[in-house]
């Protein structure tokens, strides 16, 4: 799943692997810029390990809807684990 060996992408890979997508086919994607796409908004993790990541695109109902163009970005910031995580929209 990793497209690059940079630490940022490795961190995002761990985050993506922690997300369960029981419905349909997940559209989790990573690019070299360190961005991630999740299958559903509900799939956003409760925590992000050692990373500050901006999620700019959320796929819904089998379709892809780019929310970054509307300025509706979601940033998840965490310290070292789920207990110290904060989520800001």
From Swiss-Prot:
InterPro entries in the cross-refs: Tuberculin
Region (Disordered): 61-89
Keyword field contains Cell membrane: no
A UniProt-annotated Pfam family: Tuberculin
Origin: domain of life: Bacteria
Cysteines engaged in disulfide bonds, as pairs: 27-59
Keywords: Disulfide bond
Described function: Tuberculin is the soluble, proteinaceous cell substance of the bacterium, to which infected animals become hypersensitive and react characteristically to dermal injections.
Note: This protein is the most potent component with tuberculin activity so far purified and characterized.
Name of protein: Tuberculin-active protein
């Amino acid at each position: 799943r990793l497209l690059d060996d940079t630490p940022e992408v490795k961190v995002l890979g761990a985050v993506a692997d922690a997300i369960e997508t029981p419905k349909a086919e997940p559209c989790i994607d990573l690019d070299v810029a360190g961005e991630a796409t999740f299958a559903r908004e509900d799939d956003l993790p409760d925590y992000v390990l050692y990373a500050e990541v901006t999620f700019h695109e959320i796929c819904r109902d089998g379709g892809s809807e780019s929310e970054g163009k509307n300025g509706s970005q979601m940033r998840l910031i965490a310290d070292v684990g789920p207990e110290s995580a904060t989520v800001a929209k």
